Amino acid sequence: MTKDFKISVSAALISALFSSPYAFADDYDGIPNLTAVQISPNADPALGLEYPVRPPVPGAGGLNASAKGIHSIAIGATAEAAKGAAVAVGAGSIATGVNSVAIGPLSKALGDSAVTYGAASTAQKDGVAIGARASTSDTGVAVGFNSKADAKNSVAIGHSSHVAANHGYSIAIGDRSKTDRENSVSIGHESLNRQLTHLAAGTKDTDAVNVAQLKKEIEKTQENTNKRSAELLANANAYADNKSSSVLGIANNYTDSKSAETLENARKEAFAQSKDVLNMAKAHSNSVARTTLETAEEHANSVARTTLETAEEHANKKSAEALASANVYADSKSSHTLKTANSYTDVTVSNSTKKAIRESNQYTDHKFRQLDNRLDKLDTRVDKGLASSAALNSLFQPYGVGKVNFTAGVGGYRSSQALAIGSGYRVNENVALKAGVAYAGSSDVMYNASFNIEW
């Protein structure tokens, strides 16, 4: 194909030079008396050109074609080869740089060593544009119809592929592929994605990774994650069990201590109140008894005196009878009075004792209710503390060196729940930092921070 193409170009050059009456060649760099390319039957069989014994001169063929540089060639209507060794082939083609080549109608090689091949293709300095309407910036390469390498040192391969001007050192490969950043390789665009197939596994840090490698790493990561999760769960359970036992022991000791204290206080209070009641009842009973006895003595003495006086007045015969009647009456009154006093004392003491016991029971119940409320609050705090601890233990440590992570976790114990958030940083393979805070509602907040060294 390359050999045939060269032969075709040579034939086209010979035909154009023989047939165009308007072809011309300027003086060599303004030096007079130097002849241009001559075309004659004695020309070289391969090119149809014959040079005199002078420096090489440019050649042109076609209507208004212009070859101005040394060794330059312009073929086609208005074709222009402006600098040394430049080649412009095709109507309206332009090659303005040294060693530049423009092949195709309206093609433009606008810088040194620029090469274009295709209708209306354009290449800047050191650029290569192949395909109709293909265009490049300096040192760019564009291959394919309407392909554009607008950034320096960029490559666009494929129909309508495009590297934007601000995406230097980027490559777009494939039909309508577009780049979106510097130093990138694109094989599609935002709504057209393609796959790289038959990709070998990467071996260096800068190599691409294929799906097989990725799956293997995912499985390895999952295995490590599961192992680490199991270890963390076991540690969390052990920590929770230890804390639960410790908190439960403290709560039980506190409860036992407070219960014993409450019972002792209630016993002392009840004993003191009962003692006071008994003392009051005893004092009242003694007072009533003394009053009754004094009244009975006064009454008996009065009756005795009256009876004695009457007996003395009415005769000695009646004295014994009157005295007996007086004694019976006195005994009856004394017995009745004593029974009344004892009954009154018993009722008073019974009522006072019942009241004391009732008040003591009410006081004891109130204290126990207060103790229950405190224990309930203590249980709630313990549950929230364990839930916060579980949430903090669920936070992950970053595994990659130089990586910072942000992690969140939840935890619960019985009816309490907590939310924990935290962050960690792995300084290197042996040193890592981590901190977190947990919230369990109201003002219940727990936090931790850790520093890890491995070897």
Curated annotation (Swiss-Prot):
Record's keyword terms, sorted: Cell adhesion, Cell outer membrane, Coiled coil, Membrane, Plasmid, Protein transport, Signal, Transmembrane, Transmembrane beta strand, Transport, Virulence
Consequence recorded when altering residue 155 to D: Less than 1% of wild-type collagen-binding activity
GO cellular component: a single term: cell surface
CDD domains: LbR_YadA-like
Induction of the gene: Induced at 37 degrees Celsius by the temperature-dependent transcriptional activator LcrF (VirF).
Gene Ontology biological-process entries: cell adhesion; protein secretion by the type V secretion system
Region Outer membrane translocation of the passenger domain, residue ranges: 364-402
Region of interest (Translocator domain), residue spans: 403-455
Ranges that cross the membrane: 402-412, 416-427, 434-440, 444-455
Gene3D superfamilies: GSPII I/J protein-like, Serralysin-like metalloprotease, C-terminal
UniProt effect for mutating residue 29 to N: In strain: Serotype O:9
Effect noted on mutating residue 49 to Q: In strain: Serotype O:9
Oligomer status and interactors: Homotrimer; in gels migrates as monomers, dimers and homotrimers. Does not form trimers with distantly related EibA from E.coli; coexpression was lethal and one of the genes is eliminated in vivo. If the full translocator domain (368-455) is exchanged with that of EibA ('299-392'), will form heterotrimers with EibA and vice-versa.
Family indicated by similarity: Belongs to the autotransporter-2 (AT-2) (TC 1.B.40) family.
Name listed for the protein in its UniProt record: Adhesin YadA
Lineage of producing organism: Bacteria, Pseudomonadati, Pseudomonadota, Gammaproteobacteria, Enterobacterales
Gene name, Swiss-Prot/TrEMBL: yadA
